[in-house]
Amino acid sequence: MAVIKPFKGIRPPQELVEQVASRPYDVLNSEEAREEAKGNEKSLYHIIEPEIDFPVGTDEHDACVYEKAAENFKLFQDKGWLVQDDKENYYIYAQTMNGKTQYGLVVGAYVPDYMNGIIKKHELTRRDKEEDRMKHVRVNNANIEPVFFAYPDNAVLDAIIKKYTSQKPAYDFIAPGDGFGHTFWIVDQAGDIASITAEFAKMPA
């Protein structure tokens, strides 16, 4: 069985989402992130690639850079650029690119499921990159960016996704960085939350 749980997401207010949104940290280098974040103090790059707040050439793995990530994460929350939800939810996230849309559930995953093979590895990753992101998670006590998993076709989950995606989303915008459409819904009804948890619990791996 796969163990998942809802969580209190920390996310931007609707009116700030386009300013906060960024591309994944691993699709661009420090200088590209520095350029995309130029003039935008609300860009998530200040958290996921905090070396941009230091002089060019600063070692991105220096302890002070990780400390800056934590400092910026706290600053974003203090200023209301990132706000934690009051209750635990699941979320639905859709990406639209080249005329095609893919939907996913945003959930809290159970790390031991990854370690014991319930969650299957789908790619070979570099150890240095893994260490970097683990340090980032530890210093922030938060996973700032999602990790994508796949799961088998499931009619119950499909129905829940269809139910929410037929409603007005919390966010719906085209990101300036990648030109992709990003749409986001909040799964906040107790029955739906319980159903999602139960369906994943039925999955052997």
Annotated model-derived regions:
Residues M1-P204:
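A cross-family signal for N-terminal binding/gating loops and helix N-caps
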